């Protein structure tokens, strides 16, 4: 394997433990010596504090890293666990950033989504400025459901935040003109942003490197003056999400900005000429007043229909019978019902649908969406 300079690295059975952001994979012939050298360094060098294992697992100390690596039994890496007792098998199943150390830093902030969702999304690479929790804590959130079930690491009160220096290290490697989604597992404008400003600083960096950013948020703060002054209209794409126009109803199931403020933020950004879309996500039966929806002053709307699993059904007021189609662990509404809903949306110049069900995705791509190759329908400005 090719070697790249790093302060310290060891590879065993395909898993790499490293210090720093650069990786050096040892040739097989030198692996045994590398492991011994690493073990000696871990146990004797008290200055090593940021050894990590690929799969985005942090260790609190060099001794923890050494214990993880050398505590495996005959079952090999599949039996290994990190300091929190999470097995490698679960780490392979969970999205990047779901497993973190006990520190406040969020290291799994950069992820290219694969699988069912990744194969359909035109912008599969996401940058989460915050992770392992979201202050909006929506009842229907699939990321919350996934992380809670696999690791119990979801903490909406104390979410973790990415280090801006590490973000810049990643962004330097991203080709100019790429569009990254800001906020994949969590909302990049959740309440902690008003304290940490990681998203604000990330936007500044993306401007510097000519990288586009697709912001998906339930917060009205994206239209605050300090963000308006920073966002580049050629690079910024904003989608502001709501599920209802009833502020009281929304407050029962999410801790985001009141929908009335989100509508105002959408209309403000539209008037300023930004590429903005009103995002009905997810659409929940009986929650939307279509008269109010069609009065929103925005050219574009994106619709994403609620998908559920047994956990979401148990904590959310929906009827299982309304979701007759099963795919990839989720239950979906019928295509006929989705089309009925879409026929009521008349107040926007362009309506597009984001859908994870394969059959429905293909239908909307081929027969409905204005941009077949991009269900987000972004306005791309080329110089």
What are these language model-derived features?
Residues 125, 178-180, 213-215, 238-240, ...:
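Hydrophobic faces of well-ordered beta-strands that scaffold small-molecule active sites
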Residues 98-237, 245-248:
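Conserved Radical SAM active-site core
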Residues 1-98:
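Intrinsically disordered, charged low-complexity linkers and terminal tails
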Residues 98-102, 291-383:
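Auxiliary Fe-S-binding modules of radical SAM enzymes
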Residues 232-238, 296-301:
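Glycine-enriched alpha-helix->loop->beta-strand junction motifs that scaffold or abut catalytic
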Residues 185-187, 218-220, 241-245, 281-285, ...:
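Active-site beta-loop-alpha junctions enriched in small/polar residues
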Residues 207, 228-232, 263-273, 343-349:
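Surface-exposed amphipathic alpha-helices with a cationic face
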Residues 254-255, 265-288:
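Conserved strand-turn element in the central/C-terminal portion of the radical SAM core barrel
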């Amino acid at each position: 394997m090719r070697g790249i300079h790093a302060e310290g690295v060891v590879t065993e059975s395909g898993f790499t433990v490293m210090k720093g952001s650069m990786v050096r994979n040892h040739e097989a012939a030198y692996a045994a010596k590398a492991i011994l050298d690493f073990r000696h360094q871990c146990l004797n060098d008290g200055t090593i504090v940021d050894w990590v294992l690929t799969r985005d697992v942090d260790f609190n100390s060099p001794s923890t890293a050494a214990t993880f690596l050398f505590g495996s039994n005959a079952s090999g890496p599949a039996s290994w666990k990190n300091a929190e007792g999470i097995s490698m098998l679960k780490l392979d199943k969970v999205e990047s950033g779901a497993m973190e150390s006990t520190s406040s830093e969020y290291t799994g902030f950069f992820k290219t989504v694969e699988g069912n969702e990744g194969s359909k999304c035109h912008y599969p690479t996401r940058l989460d400025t915050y992770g392992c929790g979201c202050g909006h804590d929506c009842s229907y959130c699939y990321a919350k459901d996934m992380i809670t079930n696999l690791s119990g690491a979801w903490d909406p009160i104390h979410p973790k935040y990415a280090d801006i220096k590490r973000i810049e290290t990643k962004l330097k490697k991203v080709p100019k003109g790429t569009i990254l989604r800001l906020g994949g597992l969590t909302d990049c404008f959740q309440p902690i942003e008003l304290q940490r400003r990681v998203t604000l600083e990330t936007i500044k960096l993306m401007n510097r490197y000519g990288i586009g950013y697709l912001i998906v948020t339930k917060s009205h703060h994206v239209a605050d003056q300090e963000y308006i002054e920073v966002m580049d209209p050629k690079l910024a794409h904003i989608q502001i999400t709501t599920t209802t126009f009833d502020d009281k109803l929304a407050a029962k199931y999410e801790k985001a900005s009141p929908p009335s403020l989100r509508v105002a933020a959408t209309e403000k950004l539209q008037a300023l000429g930004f590429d903005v879309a009103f995002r009905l996500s997810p659409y929940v039966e009986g929650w939307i007043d279509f008269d109010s929806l069609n009065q929103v002053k925005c050219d574009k709307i994106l619709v994403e229909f609620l998908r559920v699993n047994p956990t979401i059904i148990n904590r959310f007021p929906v009827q299982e019978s309304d979701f007759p189609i099963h795919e990839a662990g989720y239950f979906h509404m019928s295509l006929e019902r989705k089309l009925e809903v879409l026929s009521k949306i008349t107040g926007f110049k362009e309506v597009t649908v984001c859908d994870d069900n394969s059959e429905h995705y293909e239908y909307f791509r081929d027969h409905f969406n204005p941009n077949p190759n991009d269900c987000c329908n972004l306005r791309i400005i080329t110089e």
